[in-house]
């Protein structure tokens, strides 16, 4: 009799476990089906977005901005390595790739994000441009930006305060000459703060090193370079967006 009761109890427990296992399997299957359905919807949306003219334009602008960021990172790195070097000997040219390999791709990615962000914020705020943009103005902005970086590497200043004030004045002059928008000023300051913070964190942890060992010197010019770089890349992104919109309307 006791054996029969134990057998019945074990059978009921087994059936209970089977029911729980069945419910759990059913619930997991339903969740998996919902997840697959959501994934298919996202993939379909991404495909249709990329297949559209706006999606193709976004990809083209991203690639151009990435290439510009990588190129500027290599050129500006060479200018910093070249401090107090007047000629271009082979050993100096070879040092253009002496930086960490991940720096140019990171700069390219940052340039793509910033360049796409500027026209989006302009469109969201509805802020009108102060003047008509053209590629000649954008090229002059790039030249001034490279000149500011070159000045920070070549010119000798009495102290860090003088260096900071000079580069800050040049950076604000670049913004006033080629931008003059509140969104450009705000984004430039935000980019300068965040990029300087991230860079100093990498230097502090030994992930990245500068050619100059003077930490105070580096800290004094770095925010100005990031600010002017953000304004420059933003102007490139705006010009690319304007060209893409004009081409879309003409089509």
From Swiss-Prot:
Quaternary context: Interacts with scap; interaction is direct and only takes place in the presence of sterols; it prevents interaction between scap and the coat protein complex II (COPII). Associates with the SCAP-SREBP complex; association is mediated via its interaction with scap and only takes place in the presence of sterols.
UniProt GO molecular function: oxysterol binding
Compartments, as annotated in UniProt: Endoplasmic reticulum membrane
Intervals, Extracellular compartment: 82-100, 157-159, 206-219
Keywords assigned by UniProt, alphabetized: Cholesterol metabolism, Endoplasmic reticulum, Lipid metabolism, Lipid-binding, Membrane, Steroid metabolism, Sterol metabolism, Transmembrane, Transmembrane helix
Pfam families reported in the protein's UniProt record: INSIG
Entry membrane topology: Multi-pass membrane protein
Keyword Transmembrane helix: yes
Family membership: Belongs to the INSIG family.
One GO BP annotation of this record: cholesterol metabolic process
Primary role: Oxysterol-binding protein that mediates feedback control of cholesterol synthesis by controlling both endoplasmic reticulum to Golgi transport of scap and degradation of hmgcr. Acts as a negative regulator of cholesterol biosynthesis by mediating the retention of the SCAP-SREBP complex in the endoplasmic reticulum, thereby blocking the processing of sterol regulatory element-binding proteins (SREBPs). Binds oxysterol, including 25-hydroxycholesterol, regulating interaction with scap and retention of the SCAP-SREBP complex in the endoplasmic reticulum.
Native species: Xenopus tropicalis
Chain positions of motif KxHxx: 245-251
Ranges in the topological domain labelled Cytoplasmic: 1-58, 119-133, 179-183, 238-251
Notes concerning its domains: The KxHxx motif mediates association with the coatomer complex.
Domain of life: Eukaryota
Recorded GO CC terms: endoplasmic reticulum membrane
Name of this protein: Insulin-induced gene 1 protein
Annotated site location: Required for the recognition of 25-hydroxycholesterol: 145
TM spans (from-to): 59-81, 101-118, 134-156, 160-178, 184-205, 220-237
């Amino acid at each position: 009799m006791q054996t029969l009761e134990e057998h019945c109890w074990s059978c009921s427990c087994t059936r209970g476990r089977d029911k729980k296992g069945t419910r759990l399997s059913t619930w997991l299957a339903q969740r998996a089906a919902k997840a697959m359905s959501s994934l298919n919807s996202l993939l379909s949306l991404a495909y249709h977005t990329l297949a559209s003219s706006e999606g193709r334009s976004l990809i083209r602008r991203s690639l151009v901005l990435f290439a510009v960021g990588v190129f500027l990172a290599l050129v500006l790195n060479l200018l910093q390595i070249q401090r107090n070097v007047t000629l271009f000997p082979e050993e100096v040219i070879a040092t253009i790739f002496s930086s960490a390999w991940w720096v140019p791709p990171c700069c390219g990615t940052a340039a793509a994000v910033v360049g796409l962000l500027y026209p989006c914020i302009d469109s969201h705020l509805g802020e009108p441009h102060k003047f008509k943009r053209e590629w000649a103005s954008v090229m002059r902005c790039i030249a001034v930006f490279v000149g500011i970086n070159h000045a920070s590497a070549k010119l000798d200043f009495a102290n860090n305060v003088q260096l900071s004030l000079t580069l800050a004045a040049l950076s604000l002059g670049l913004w006033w000459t080629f931008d003059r928008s509140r969104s450009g000023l705000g984004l430039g300051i935000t980019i300068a703060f965040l990029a300087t913070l991230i860079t100093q964190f990498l230097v502090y942890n030994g992930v990245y090193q500068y050619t100059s060992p003077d930490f105070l010197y580096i800290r004094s010019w770095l925010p100005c370079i990031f600010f002017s770089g953000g304004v420059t890349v933003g102007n490139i992104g705006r010009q690319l967006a304007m060209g893409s919109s004009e081409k879309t309307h003409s089509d």
